[in-house]
């Protein structure tokens, strides 16, 4: 894309891509990283999110350095962690994992942390961590089983996707909604603008959206 620096999203998440597009930013490439997202023993939620976002950015940078067309691009990575207290919930891929997450979240408060890592064209690293507090309604067993049947939870931190059916489970939310979806837009665009990325460049092309 001519007229602005190139930008790479270090993620294969359709949700993060859609959020970046929502802000009028279309990445020139996607570089999802194959990173082991298992929390370390005793690792706190904030530390886990920061570590994984940095690891994804590191992996994307190595890929970009080998690509003549992308070398010197901005790189954005993110990692989202859902936690009850200090307990980190998994990115559920199995029915049992998702069921356990939903039973734990039922009628309770939890926190969603997303760490963003920005790599500048000069390969400096900038990072932000965003926290949102969420409270779910008390879920019946019928709620849980029907939601499991939807398949919407698969691969999602904490076993739910707030932008879908699970949005109806939320009694209260304090903080950024887009953070819970997977990419806090205010903090992401502020980080980019602070490093000289022209965040308004694509706005004129979104009139028909």
UniProtKB/Swiss-Prot annotation:
Localization: Cytoplasm
Listed EC numbers: 3.6.1.9
Gene3D superfamilies according to UniProt: 3.90.950.10
Positions bearing the site annotation: Important for substrate specificity: 15, 80, 163
EC class of the enzyme, as a word: hydrolase
Domain of life of the organism encoding this protein: Bacteria
Cofactor: a divalent metal cation
MF term (GO), any: dTTP diphosphatase activity
InterPro entries: ITPase-like_fam, Maf-like
Catalytic site: 79 (proton acceptor)
GO CC annotation terms, alphabetical: cytoplasm
Main location: cytoplasm
Keywords of this entry: Cytoplasm, Hydrolase, Nucleotide metabolism
Keyword Heme set for record: no
Catalytic activity reported: dTTP + H2O = dTMP + diphosphate + H(+); UTP + H2O = UMP + diphosphate + H(+)
GO BP term (any one): nucleotide metabolic process
Stored NCBIfam families: maf (TIGR00172), PRK01441.1 (NF002401)
Family according to the record: Belongs to the Maf family. YhdE subfamily.
Record-given protein name: dTTP/UTP pyrophosphatase
Lineage of the species this protein comes from: Bacteria, Pseudomonadati, Pseudomonadota, Alphaproteobacteria, Hyphomicrobiales
